[in-house]
From Swiss-Prot:
One GO MF term: NADH dehydrogenase (ubiquinone) activity
Entry's family note: Belongs to the complex I subunit 5 family.
Any one of the GO CC terms: respiratory chain complex I
Gene (name only): nduo-5
InterPro entries membership: ND/Mrp_TM (IPR001750), NU5C-like (IPR003945)
Function (record text): Core subunit of the mitochondrial membrane respiratory chain NADH dehydrogenase (Complex I) that is believed to belong to the minimal assembly required for catalysis. Complex I functions in the transfer of electrons from NADH to the respiratory chain. The immediate electron acceptor for the enzyme is believed to be ubiquinone.
Secretion signal, residue range per the UniProt entry: none
Catalytic activity, reaction form: a ubiquinone + NADH + 5 H(+)(in) = a ubiquinol + NAD(+) + 4 H(+)(out)
Membrane topology, record value: Multi-pass membrane protein
Superkingdom of the source species: Eukaryota
Predominant cellular place of this UniProt entry's protein: mitochondrion
Keywords per UniProt: Electron transport, Membrane, Mitochondrion, Mitochondrion inner membrane, NAD, Respiratory chain, Translocase, Transmembrane, Transmembrane helix, Transport, Ubiquinone
Protein name (record): NADH-ubiquinone oxidoreductase chain 5
Amino acid sequence: MNISIFLIGFVFFMGGISVWLMPTFKLGIFFLEWDFLSLKFNFYFNSILFSFILFLVTFSVLVFSTYYLNSELNFNYYYFVLLIFVGSMFSLNFSNSIFTMLLSWDLLGISSFFLVLFYNNWDSCSGAMNTALTNRLGDYFMFVFFGLSVFSGYYFLSFSMFSSYMSLLLLLTAFTKSAQFPFSSWLPKAMSAPTPVSSLVHSSTLVTAGLILLMNFNNLVMQKDFISFVLIIGLFTMFFSSLASLVEEDLKKVVALSTLSQMGFSMVTLGLGLSFISFIHLVSHALFKSCLFMQVGYIIHCSFGQQDGRNYSNNGNLPNFIQLQMLVTLFCLCGLIFSSGAVSKDFILELFFSNNYMMFFSLMFFVSVFLTFGYSFRLWKSFFLSFNKVMNHYSSTVFMNFLSLVLVIFSISFLWWMNFNLLNIPSLFLYVDFFGPLVFLFMMIFLSFLILKMLFKELMYKFLVDYLAKNSIYKMKNLKFMDLFLNNINSKGYTLFLSSGMFKNYYLKSLNFNSVVVLIFIFFMIC
């Protein structure tokens, strides 16, 4: 136990030193250099920072897996495939050659297929096949892209002639891996995987691979037509995934659609030409989304696998520390002020609305950001503000309370620390003038919410029919209980009426009541 604590402390100490040295650290290593076969890795600021976050999330997920999959027979198989999955993401992050990038990209898709297929039921089989086929389509685009690049390098083809087509292939490759519109269908279906896998996939591995690829080819993508195309695709992904998360009942799919919305947000940032700010938002999202998935997975696991949000209630029995962690991660997801989500989101919103885009796109972007609060509150309401019943058993252990404490601390403070030491991103937080428009913005949102509530009261019909009727049927289905309840009401009601009647008769016969009647009669006669 002491050795493990020492190793964990040593790893975090070395990670802190690496973060401290990151701004001035540049290193390139090649193990083999022979024509096409090149094993070359670059260690730059972005790659080291992302690998540090990936290591932190992976460590928390591996520890959480020992709790979540404790009784699984294929646990060793799961660990083996998961380590291949994480290793391929590390390799893709550091790779600087065609061979290593193709190898890492292919391993990432194959290992994700086996992880989604872990439970081996109908949902996992269909989800794994959908994931594999969509990623295979992206692999095809990537092979064609690198093939054209190799021929252009050997001067068989003109690079200027094929650069636009190659850039389009690169964009399609990133869109399939990051589940952008119209390749978004595989991401909710991949929720049939175990929750620790979902926590890793949706935070810092599979869905971020496409964005990492575009950032590596930043000079090729940053053309006027292509960044406008990236911006529009990111807007559509963000808008439709936010709308879908408001009507989805599966809680894991709600969190998955929120991930899709944030990936669209990062793609919009990349379309603005802010590749580094998009990377910073990816880092922030990886921290709090992995923690949110762990909290949701813990609640689902303690509720015996119940994922329907309509059947949850009375989760106040959860450990208070777990509730606090979930609330903090939802605050970071919304981008509330003084959270890590606000650091990147504020700067992105400022730069988006400072540009003169079409009114339609600006309105779509504003509605999509506003819907983030909608599905975050819906997720909180499903767990803690509902009135339906589901069987649950919560184990309030110290291990589960402090499992994702490191992720929560980093979600709150890491980007703020980077802001004051490395980045200098949101200088608006230093000025009082920023808070004036913020107050008016909150007032507009509040008034819009009240108007929508008054205009769309007919939407309550679904709630009254589906939720209240179901709850009433659940309470009235035990007829023996109803008989005893009515019998108890009859006996106690008869006793109550009998005692009150005897009291009235006694009071009416008394002298005091007669005196009061005489005084009232005299008063009316005088008036």
